[in-house]
């Protein structure tokens, strides 16, 4: 097995085996398109990249994670450190079967440089071991695992982290997972559906439905009606789904919403409601539109009276 790996401080243009960190001050956009310095969270960016060749098969591994600075001892920073560490442990390699033991970092989980390096190495090793078996049977394929967890948007009341997980383990195409998590600054609590008044679930679904119509529309095929929309989607009858969620079969997304610069963001994962060709159906509902449907927690995050 041929391995390429280099650990230490490296320039961004290095293609194989790099572990590097840089201090980044993220900025938040203002209403006029300008930007002001963020006053909530400063992060370091840690990236692991490695490749391996196993006879006729190949492995690519990339883990890229933002992490609060070591000197930040706020409850928000502590909450995010634990969240980032768990995310790296969960996504260090493609899902290769139920028999795969989860990776658990035995060192200091607040040391993201060492955690990312250990997780990256473990992922390359496990993918290589499986590909060795496949190569021995004459298969030519590759495993790609690309995970990113980045600071997406922040205010003095909340911070949103975005994660993107791109995996390929052979076959016609890979898989892409997008998730985001919003954290309340004052206590580091992770927020999700509790930002909305779910007693108004039918109105929330109605807003999402209108956004999905726009998402699936094209220049020569505008989707206006519910009937047109559901001809594009791929839905299943689920006996466990409450009756009030079954209007034309559209449920709330399995992934909780998050707060971004231009509104509340909703995202369905691949195959959740649509065929692969439609990707990840996603909707951003502007804050002035979603405001009447917010819970007390959601209104607090957006500083709404």
Language model segments and positions:
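Bacterial N-terminal signal peptides that target proteins for export
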Residues: 1-10
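C-terminal motif of bacterial Sec signal peptides marking the signal peptidase cleavage site
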Residues: 19-22
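Core hydrophobic alpha-helical transmembrane segments of single-pass membrane proteins
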Residues: 11-16
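Compositionally biased intrinsically disordered regions enriched in Thr/Gly
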Residues: 24-305
């Amino acid at each position: 097995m041929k391995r390429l790996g280099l650990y230490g401080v490296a320039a961004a243009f290095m293609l194989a085996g790099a572990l590097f960190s840089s201090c980044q001050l993220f900025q938040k956009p203002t209403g006029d398109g300008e930007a002001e310095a963020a006053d909530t969270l400063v992060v370091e960016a840690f990236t692991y990249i490695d490749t391996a060749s196993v006879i006729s098969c190949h492995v690519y591994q990339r883990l890229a994670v933002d992490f609060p600075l070591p000197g930040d001892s706020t409850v928000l920073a502590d909450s995010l450190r634990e969240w980032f560490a768990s995310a790296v442990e969960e996504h260090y390699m493609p899902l290769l079967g139920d028999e795969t033991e989860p990776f658990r970092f035995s060192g200091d989980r607040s040391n993201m440089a060492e955690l990312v390096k250990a997780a990256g190495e473990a992922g390359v090793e496990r993918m290589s071991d499986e590909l060795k078996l496949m190569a021995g049977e004459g298969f030519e394929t590759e495993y790609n695992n690309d995970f990113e967890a980045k600071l997406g948007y922040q205010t003095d009341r909340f911070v949103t982290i975005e994660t993107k997980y791109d995996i390929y383990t052979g076959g016609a195409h890979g898989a892409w997972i997008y998730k985001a998590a919003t954290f309340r600054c004052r206590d580091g609590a992770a927020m999700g559906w509790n930002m909305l008044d779910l007693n108004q679930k039918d109105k929330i679904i109605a807003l999402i439905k209108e956004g999905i119509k726009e998402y699936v529309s094209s220049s020569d095929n505008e989707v206006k009606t519910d009937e047109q929309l559901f001809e594009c989607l791929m839905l299943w009858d689920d006996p466990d789904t409450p009756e009030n969620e079954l209007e034309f079969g559209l449920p709330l997304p399995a992934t909780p919403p998050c707060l971004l610069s231009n509104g509340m963001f909703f995202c369905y994962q691949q195959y959740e409601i649509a065929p692969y060709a439609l990707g990840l159906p996603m909707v951003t509902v502007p804050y002035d539109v979603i405001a009447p449907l917010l819970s007390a927690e959601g209104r607090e995050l957006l500083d709404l009276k």
